[in-house]
Amino acid sequence: MFDMPNDQKIPRNNGNAEVDGGIGVDWGKTSRDYAEHRPGPPLSFYQRLAALEIGLPGQTVLDLGTGTGVIARQMARQGCKVWATDISDTQVKMAQTLATEENLDITFATASAETTKFADHRFDVITAHQCFLYFDLDKALPAILKMLKPNGVLVISHFSWLPLICDIAKASEQLILRHNPKWQAHSYSGRTYPNYPGMHPQFHYSGYFYYDVETPFTRESWRGRIRASRGVGASMNAAEIAAFDAAHAEMLETMTEGDFTVTHRIDAHIFSAGSVEN
């Protein structure tokens, strides 16, 4: 199970309207910072997936909630045939731009996880990175099940800083809360284990891993990473973001001497289509 901050559990129907007290979350507002400053998982993450025969050349992959296409682009680099969707048209346009710059052949579309439709049994792999909590599971999981091949897999993954271990992450979270007290995605304990809630009975666990990495940042890139978070860029207005960012810059001047690392935890929950008896 992915341990939701503040003991929240993943609801069966959780749209953006229900997040952070309904303040409104628009990831499209973060696209520039997201693309420039929000790092994806390191190559070791994809190597671990490859050891489980996920992300191999020639596999068909659908990346749901693709954002700026971090997972989709790496899968394409590895020789997969990739499709990717996101509910935000702004994010999709940024993802397409970044893929085009690398001459990567990825088919992008603007669609929610619940309304993404392809032919039955189309994909070897469907990925959902940092986005599964936003899905309406009653609608998304049956759709995912239909799109997966009989031996296909769903990969739910996260790449989260650890504020209880890293003082910089903790201080940044405290500052976010002073500017946006409704933000709920704070104080992640790092707790994770293979018992993901709310899954469809026609999925069963076929793999799971987690590990920690030290992710390098500069003051500027960490400011950008925090601006690209839900509690700042996706929910504050321009004036609020500017005020927060100025305070954040001042805080980092006193806490850091330049380059630093932030401890992150990576976890991946891998589900195969079909009940465990099959």
Residue ranges and their predicted role:
Residues 116-125:
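A short acidic, Gly/Pro-enriched loop at the edge of an enzyme's catalytic core
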Residues 135-144:
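A short, conserved alpha-helix within the catalytic core of class I
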Residues 145, 149-215:
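Conserved catalytic/acceptor-binding region of the Class I
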Residues 128-129, 157:
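Residues lining the SAM
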Residues 2-56:
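Conserved class I S-adenosyl-L-methionine
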Residues 194-278:
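Conserved Class I S-adenosyl-L-methionine
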Residues 60-62, 68-115:
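Class I SAM-dependent methyltransferase SAM/SAH-binding core
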